[in-house]
From Swiss-Prot:
Domain of life: Eukaryota
Record carries keyword Cytoplasm: yes
Family: Belongs to the KLHL40 family.
Organism: Xenopus tropicalis
Name used for this protein in its record: Kelch-like protein 40
Principal localisation: cytoplasm
Protein role: Substrate-specific adapter of a BCR (BTB-CUL3-RBX1) E3 ubiquitin ligase complex that acts as a key regulator of skeletal muscle development.
An example Gene Ontology biological process: positive regulation of proteasomal ubiquitin-dependent protein catabolic process
Chain ranges passing through the membrane: none
Gene: klhl40
Kelch repeat positions: 353-405, 406-455, 456-503, 505-550, 552-606
Oligomer and partners: Component of the BCR(KLHL40) E3 ubiquitin ligase complex.
Length: 614
């Protein structure tokens, strides 16, 4: 009767430990030593049986009739004695210290002597250490040592972050084969195929005479059928390295013909002789292999991974982040948001980076000023929130804006005793990941909104020290380091929605000194004038406005409704409205949407392949 799996595993582990401990004890006491490895003057006594059991390299040596395999002392060349010492220690103990400094040497020696267990440990270590600065080196190492697992992991890392890595000069040191291995991948995270062409030509121009010869082969990995015809005509065919190469022009003509529907006859791919059966027929896993029909590589029109981006309304709350696609009326689960504070402000930058700030963060290490606010960034690759340097000043009811590489956190109320209204402006520098102070606002304000347009930051409305709603509008020019007053709003308000829509700044609903309002105003940045806009159907506070693909949406907020007792109380609404530009009216498209409660809303471009449809 067979033993249960768990018990059998326990017995196996016990026996392995007993055997390994016994072998190590014999090594320590020089018992049954029948082999000495000599490396650069250092000697390593060991057992032939142990080496043969762990390494096919040594097994083949000892079982051969070669003179070297019969010697007790074996000289090894091109090996570092310290590295070999670590490997022998691992063989006898299963213990090895791998660091960023020694991993490549250990990896190479393990590969040389065919020790799969150490090889696997090194691969796992390098996979965990993959980063922007080493991914290309690890990719090349994986190819050099013929390790597909490592090479593919590093290549996928490069493909995911292609925009960033293609900026690094090291990328342009890749060999033609290495470059092809990257750009031929379906997982390339790019929106437009033109980016691949531009990177390839930049690579070729680095060593023009030498690399131009490789372009006909490399062009097979560029998916020209995904590139607009005008771009091919005006950019590709007119490039200095292309227009003088007849072979490249011939390939491009094939692409243009294909774009017009004139595809060449597909070539039948026959199985190789290695996979043929007795009668010459292709056999795969016992089944007959059908002949495949394939077009030339340059006519490949399979979409890249990064081409599955969609514009969505991104809803961020303390329970989860959900993406809503209004065009298809579909919701996608994006991320759990356990780190997101309830009272937060969100921001989507021009580069599609998503940030959240707010809440209360207590730092025990900072004895003088332990209170700060959370600051998080959404990681599109892992669909998770990354903790960024916290906001130095804990505050609420502030606004977020952006210009170039800076994020501005403006005004608000201090989360300390007294709840002082602030005029201070904090500036987060994205390249250096550091907070600093910027020019203060000319007045103290909270409950306002902030929008960004053409690298200018606008502050609108809110309440001042006297708790009265403001009409005031200011704009900050980061290049001139100055604030400037603009034409005031028609209605003083706070806690309202705002967005930039078709070049104009819109503000909607909110709280006035006499109650809620449903009025909407539009500010023309060119004329510095406000004009009335179609009213929202209901008076609300904290209504969110989102402009996406030329369409204006209004989401959620709080309205005053009558409860069962006849009392009028603020009620949160989770509906979505769309503005009909032709008929100039608001149309409800969803009565209630999940996860909208307590959420903030931004327009974001998200890859639907990374999301889970709800």
């Amino acid at each position: 009767m067979a033993l249960p799996t768990q018990q059998a595993d326990e017995l196996r582990l016990y026996q392995q430990t007993l055997l390994q401990d016994g072998l190590k004890d014999m090594l320590d006491h020089d018992n049954f030593i029948d082999c000495v490895l000599k490396i650069q003057g250092k000697e390593f006594p060991c057992h032939r049986l142990v080496l043969a059991a762990c390494s096919p390299y040594f097994r083949a040596m000892f079982l051969s009739n070669l003179e070297e395999g019969k010697k007790k002392e074996i000289d090894l060349e091109d090996v570092d004695p310290d590295v070999m010492g670590k490997i022998l220690h691992y063989i006898y103990t299963s213990e090895i210290e791998i660091t960023e400094k020694n991993v490549q040497d250990i990896f190479s020696v393990a590969n040389m002597f065919q020790i799969p267990s150490i090889f696997t440990v090194c691969v796992s270590f390098l996979q965990k250490k993959l980063c922007l600065s080493n991914c290309l080196a690890i990719f090349r190492l994986g190819l050099l040592l013929d390790c597909p697992r490592l090479a593919v992991s590093a290549r996928d890392f490069v493909c995911d972050r292609f925009h960033l890595i293609a900026r690094d000069e090291e990328f342009y040191d890749l060999s033609p084969d290495e470059l092809i291995a990257v750009i031929s991948s379906d997982s390339l995270n790019i929106e437009k195929e033109e980016e691949v062409f531009e990177v390839v030509l930049k690579w070729a121009l680095k060593e023009k005479e030498k690399r131009a010869k490789a372009l006909p082969i490399i062009f097979e990995s560029i998916r020209f059928r995904l590139i607009p015809q005008d771009y091919i005509k005006n950019k590709v065919e007119k490039h200095e390295l292309v227009k003088s190469d007849k072979e490249l022009l011939k390939k491009l003509q094939m692409v243009k013909d294909a774009q017009e529907g004139k595809l060449p006859a597909a070539v039948k791919k026959t199985p190789s002789k290695a996979s043929e059966g007795k009668d010459g027929e292709g056999v795969v896993n016992g089944d007959l292999e059908e002949e495949e029909e394939a077009l030339p590589g340059i006519l490949n029109d399979t979409l890249r991974f990064g081409m599955f981006l969609k514009d969505m309304i991104f809803m961020i709350s303390d329970t989860g982040a959900v993406a809503y696609d209004p065009s298809a009326n579909e919701c996608f689960f994006a991320s759990l948001s356990a780190q997101i504070p309830k009272n937060h402000v969100s921001l989507a930058t021009k580069e599609n980076q998503l940030f959240v700030a707010g809440g209360l963060y207590y730092n025990e290490e900072n004895k003088d000023d332990p209170l700060s606010s959370y600051f998080l960034q959404f990681d599109h690759l892992d669909s998770d929130w990354l903790g960024m340097p916290p906001v130095p000043s804990a505050r609420c009811l502030f606004g977020l804006g952006e210009s170039d590489n800076s994020i501005y956190l403006i005004g608000g109320k201090e989360l300390k005793e007294g709840e002082q209204t602030l005029d201070t402006v904090l500036c987060y520098d994205r390249p250096s990941f550091k907070w600093g102070e910027s020019d203060p606002l000319p007045y103290q304000v909270y409950g306002h909104t902030v929008v960004s347009h053409d690298n200018l930051v606008y502050v609108l409305g809110g309440k001042g020290n006297e708790k009265k709603c403001l009409k005031r509008v200011c704009v900050y020019n980061p290049k001139k380091f100055e604030w400037k007053d603009l034409a005031p709003m028609k209605t003083a308000r706070s806690l309202f929605g705002s967005t930039v829509h078709k070049g104009k700044i819109l503000i909607a609903a909110g709280v006035t000194d006499t109650g809620l309002t449903n009025t909407i105003e539009a500010y023309d940045v060119k004329t510095n004038k406000w004009e009335e806009f179609t009213e929202f159907p209901q008076e609300r506070s904290s209504l969110s406005l989102v402009s996406m693909n030329g369409t204006l949406y209004a989401i959620g907020g709080f309205a005053t409704t009558e409860n069962e007792s006849g009392e009028f109380v603020p009620t949160e609404l989770n509906d979505i409205w769309r503005f009909n530009e032709e008929e100039k009216k608001w149309e409800g498209i969803l009565r209630e949407i999940r996860y909208a409660s307590g959420a903030t809303f931004v327009a974001a471009r998200l890859n639907i392949l990374r999301l889970t449809k709800m």
